[in-house]
């Protein structure tokens, strides 16, 4: 299951495809409004979910237990972009001040955006942030079918432990995820290195109605950004950077220990 559906999660989509080609039962669905990943994992409704290490933090601060454990990295760069009505090759983040911005309200996308804004010397309070309607700039994940991309959030801030795969601790200990993890490692490396048009063609079934050209250009952007660089283990330093982001924008009350949220992928 995915908490969001996007080409940003191409390693997971390719893993699902490869598992199916190998004869495994590999259902794929997207989290519905009102559903919570930790509840679905806890109740055994799903085995493995695309989420983020940050999704554990607020729940932990509310005393929620048990929570999923994150065992494999998907992305180490934010995958959102800022789009404007017209091309602006001379765009600077300072241009956001005094303008309207339609921002994604998800906890992690918004935290990353606020951090990128601050990291680039912009006063968040001077931006008119909208939840709906039309704006001078739009903050969204790829593929982006309208507007002109003027900035990448991920390119405008340090690498960070972003999207990851999680499951229950008991399930991770069973050894059942081994085949999935082996296939996932192969899928992630292929998505990272294969020509973007080839990746787009292979995952076209997941994006009905999206042109191959748009999908390929989105994948190319993520490849160039280095979203899928590194191994599948969740690096401690990138986890700490994610904590830095959320702490900087007031998204967490305390720093959560790596071992309480992350585990190594099964060998």
Task: State each model region's role.
Residues 38, 97, 128, 178-181, ...:
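Generic structural signal for individual residues within well-ordered alpha-helical segments
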Residues 1-141, 146-159:
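Short, glycine-/small- and polar/acidic-enriched structural segments
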Residues 1-27, 34-35, 42, 229-267:
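N-terminal hydrophobic or amphipathic helices and topogenic motifs
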Residues 59-61, 89-96, 210-221, 251-267:
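Short flexible/disordered coil segments
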Residues 173-253:
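Secondary-structure end/capping motifs
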Residues 129, 136-205:
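Pocket-lining segment of extracytoplasmic ligand-binding domains
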Residues 74-84, 151-173, 181, 220-224, ...:
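Periplasmic-binding protein-like
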Residues 35-37, 137, 209-210, 265-267:
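Short, mixed-charge aromatic SLiMs
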């Amino acid at each position: 299951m995915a908490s969001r559906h996007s080409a940003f999660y191409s390693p997971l989509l390719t893993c699902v495809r490869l598992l199916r080609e190998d004869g495994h039962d590999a259902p794929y669905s997207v989290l519905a409004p009102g559903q919570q990943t930790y509840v679905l994992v806890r109740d055994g409704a799903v085995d493995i979910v695309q989420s983020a290490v940050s999704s554990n933090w607020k729940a932990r601060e509310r005393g929620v237990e048990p929570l999923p454990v994150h065992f494999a990295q998907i992305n180490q760069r934010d995958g959102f972009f800022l789009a404007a009505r017209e091309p602006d090759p001379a765009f600077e983040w300072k241009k956001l001040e005094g303008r309207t911005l339609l921002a994604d309200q998800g906890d992690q996308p918004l935290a990353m955006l606020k951090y990128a804004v601050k990291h680039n010397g912009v006063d968040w309070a001077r931006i008119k942030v909208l939840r709906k309607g039309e704006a001078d700039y739009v903050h969204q994940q790829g593929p982006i079918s309208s507007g002109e991309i003027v900035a990448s959030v991920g390119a405008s801030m340090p690498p960070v432990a972003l999207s990851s795969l999680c499951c229950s601790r008991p399930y991770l200990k069973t050894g059942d995820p081994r085949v999935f993890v082996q296939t996932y490692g192969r899928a992630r490396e292929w998505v990272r290195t294969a020509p973007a048009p080839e990746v787009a063609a292979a995952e076209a079934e997941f994006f009905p109605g999206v042109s191959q050209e748009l999908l390929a250009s989105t994948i190319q952007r993520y490849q160039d950004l280095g979203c899928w660089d590194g191994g599948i283990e969740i690096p401690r330093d990138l986890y700490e950077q994610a904590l830095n982001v959320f702490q900087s924008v007031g998204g967490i009350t305390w720093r959560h220990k790596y071992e309480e949220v992350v585990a190594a992928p099964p060998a």
